[in-house]
């Protein structure tokens, strides 16, 4: 007969108890009442937070946006085709966040920071909340360093500083994206990290931008966040916040960043779609009441940090599309009131061959000359004044038949100055080249040339100055001032090049 030893049994029981490690935890769950159009209504989820991530049975993730008395409105981050009525949903206890690291540079990702360029996973040890509070008043300092775009019209008359928010606004097909991509190209060697966020764009347009950046070697300091037109509205709404979180990661590490939102009209439309499907009351143009807050909390994250926080910066260039030049629509007026100025692109100028088609008259920068180097201030003031007078005169000259010689000269000068502002796409100019170009125009050196010869002469002058008078560039880059010595060098170069140019044209 087998004897039962009590100590053995107690040892076995003790071992089993020690091995038992099943965790007891409370899971907040709910049931799907209704699903469709990227929205799910959930019964239950009693303790869910606003903005919390929830997980459906088949793996889809959603965000709890509407917390009502008897159900929860969830927006889906996917098509949700496999979700069925009655299936279970559990709250994750997390707010939307993304991984962040240096490894994102040069990659194309979606709104959930997953790579979509087919080049493998991205390693990241840290994460940041997609929606994080903007820096407070004490954490900021006023904008004082220039962020050069490489476009004469902007850098001389509508300057942008590091930490500023400057809106690019205009009709479709007026070159808004071109201005933004040229600005990215011009950051080469400036130690600025660029983030380009494409919201609701055609996939072919995004591919074109990425190709341009790759060909020009700009992808190594750029991250592209893309949610194309066929993406769910939730992801189009989230994409700008994902871009901002990535830019903030670098900003708080004492780096300078530039972020482009292309474009916020599409984000507002995606948010309107979500809100209407969630049955939130519509307001003006059927947008929900909090559409202003949608953009203000995004754009307020752009800042120039104080010296205590390392003086990093995040410069935002949001893009907004207008319908036939109507700047007084809801989204344009909202974003104009949030930003520190706007660059207005006109379809009429674009069609007249003036590209970039910047309407200097109604474009402003509320930071102004604080975001310019001294040398640019010295030459740009005169350009602004002469162009403003030219626009007035041109309107007047349409009605007057006989104009005196002085007026004719002023009109001729204005036409050449307008010609000088024209630039090819993807050909940004350095500050030194811009200063030289503006000085040549405002001091009458182009007056004797035909309008058709102006651009050719300026291109040749830039090459001549670079090869024969390299000291000019050195003086301006080291002193940031247009000194008498620099002026003398420039005058000599203009005279010499003009003589050569006249002989060439005669031949």
Curated annotation (Swiss-Prot):
Which keywords label this protein? ATP synthesis, ATP-binding, CF(1), Chloroplast, Hydrogen ion transport, Ion transport, Membrane, Nucleotide-binding, Plastid, Thylakoid, Translocase, Transport
Q: Can you tell me which residues bind ATP?
A: 170-177
Topology relative to the membrane: Peripheral membrane protein
PROSITE patterns, alphabetized = ATPASE_ALPHA_BETA
Known EC number(s)? 7.1.2.2
SUPFAM superfamilies reported in the protein's UniProt record: C-terminal domain of alpha and beta subunits of F1 ATP synthase, N-terminal domain of alpha and beta subunits of F1 ATP synthase, P-loop containing nucleoside triphosphate hydrolases
The yes or no answer to whether the keyword Membrane is present is yes
> A Gene Ontology molecular-function term?
ATP binding
Q: Does the keyword ATP-binding apply?
A: yes
Q: Using the UniProt record, name the top-level EC class of this enzyme in a single word.
A: translocase
* Classification via Gene3D superfamilies: 2.40.30.20, ATP synthase alpha/beta chain, C-terminal domain, P-loop containing nucleotide triphosphate hydrolases
Q: Which InterPro entries match?
A: ATP_synth_asu-like_sf (IPR023366), ATP_synth_asu_C (IPR000793), ATP_synth_asu_C_sf (IPR038376), ATP_synth_F1_a_nt-bd_dom (IPR033732), ATP_synth_F1_asu (IPR005294), ATPase_a/bsu_AS (IPR020003), ATPase_F1/V1/A1_a/bsu_N (IPR004100), ATPase_F1/V1/A1_a/bsu_N_sf (IPR036121)
UniProt site positions, description: Required for activity = 363
In the record, the note on similarity to other proteins reads: Belongs to the ATPase alpha/beta chains family.
Record note on quaternary structure: F-type ATPases have 2 components, CF(1) - the catalytic core - and CF(0) - the membrane proton channel. CF(1) has five subunits: alpha(3), beta(3), gamma(1), delta(1), epsilon(1). CF(0) has four main subunits: a, b, b' and c.
Q: What does this protein do?
A: Produces ATP from ADP in the presence of a proton gradient across the membrane. The alpha chain is a regulatory subunit.
| Designated name of the protein | ATP synthase subunit alpha, chloroplastic
State which gene encodes it. Answer: atpA
